[in-house]
Each structure stands twice: as C-alpha cells, then as structure tokens.
Amino acid sequence: GGLGTRISEETHLKPKPMIEIGGRPILWHILKLYSAHGVNDFIICCGYRGYVIKEYFANYFLHMSDITFDMSANKMEVHERKAEPWRITIVDTGEETMTGGRLKRVASYIGDETFCFTYGDGLSDVDIKASIDSHRSSKKTATVTAVRPPGRFGILDMEGDNVSGFVEKPDGDGGWINGGFFVLDPAV
C-alpha cells in the first residue's frame, strides 16, 4: 500500500510489490513462499497503482507461459500453461490507508478464520507453517515474526588516521524488530 518513496525510480511506474527480483515481482515471490507452506488463498490489499497488480494477475498466463498470436485470425494460443494453486482476491483499500484500515476493509473476505498477514515488499525464508502452528498452540490473538537486524553500516577499525580493519555490516544492537510476517485471529 505504501508509495515506495525510497525506491522512486521504480515506483513511479508500479507499486513496490511489483518490483522485479529475478524476473518476477516481489509479490509473486511472497505468494510462492506461502504456497510452499500450504497457504494458497490470498487477499491482496491494493493502494498506490493497484491496477498494476490487477493487470498482472489478469494476464498471468501471458506472463508465465509461451504464447502464439495468430494476427490474421485474431487468436491467441497459450502453450504449457503454468498454473499456480492460488485463489487471489484483490481489494482496493485506498492509497493513504494505514495497515489497520486495510485489514478492516478486507474483514468480510477473511471471515472467521485465523489468517496470515504480511507486507507486499518484504522477502524472507520464514517457516510459515511453523508460525501458524506456534500461533494456534499459543492461543494468542496475534503472532508476529521478530528478527534481529544486521547493522546498517560497515564499521572501520581505526588506528590514528589509518584504517586497520573493516567489518561489513555487523550484527545490530541485539534488539528485536518486526519481521513483517503475522498470524492473526479475526478478533484483531
């Protein structure tokens, strides 16, 4: 939903989840992660340039398959359809809407089941199934994946005016931060 101001050279044309990594949008990678853990029913909260996401999935076979266009007959033939087991609901939740407002807007699509939630611009190797299992066994309303971030900058070891060593982005200060992957009960 955010505007992606830190990566504006990409996001003036498309929303952050549609920025490509390895030839596929970040959003595709997120869905593949969840799908690998058995989650295949998705609700995508759209904000800024949400139509780009809608167009991507509306034309998914064009993006993922070999295609022959017969211009004289006005026909298109899709070869080797690469289908995913996904069911995707795309909801316009507004450009300026905060996270809680987006969840409220899609509540009718969620129903009364426990659900997973993540941001559309973060990738990870989170064990989604383990997160769901942990959430269910804890009987909590909300479970968040916490991570310890690396330091933001490399550190120089100095001896007087000379650099004597360098540590590339050492571990952070030991604090935990929101890893961006949640398991939530509808009561949220």
Predicted regions and their residues:
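N-terminal glycine-rich phosphate-binding loop and ensuing alpha1 helix
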Residues: 1-59
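Alpha-helix/helix-capping structural signal
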Residues: 2, 48, 129, 186-187
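Short Gly/Pro-enriched turn/cap motifs at secondary-structure boundaries
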Residues: 9, 146, 171-174
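Generic beta-sheet signal
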Residues: 21, 45, 93, 143-146, ...
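Conserved beta-loop-beta/alpha segment of the NTase-like Rossmann-fold superfamily
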Residues: 52-160
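Short, flexible, basic/aromatic active-site loop/helix in glycosyltransferases
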Residues: 158-174
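Conserved nucleotide-sugar donor-binding
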Residues: 179-188
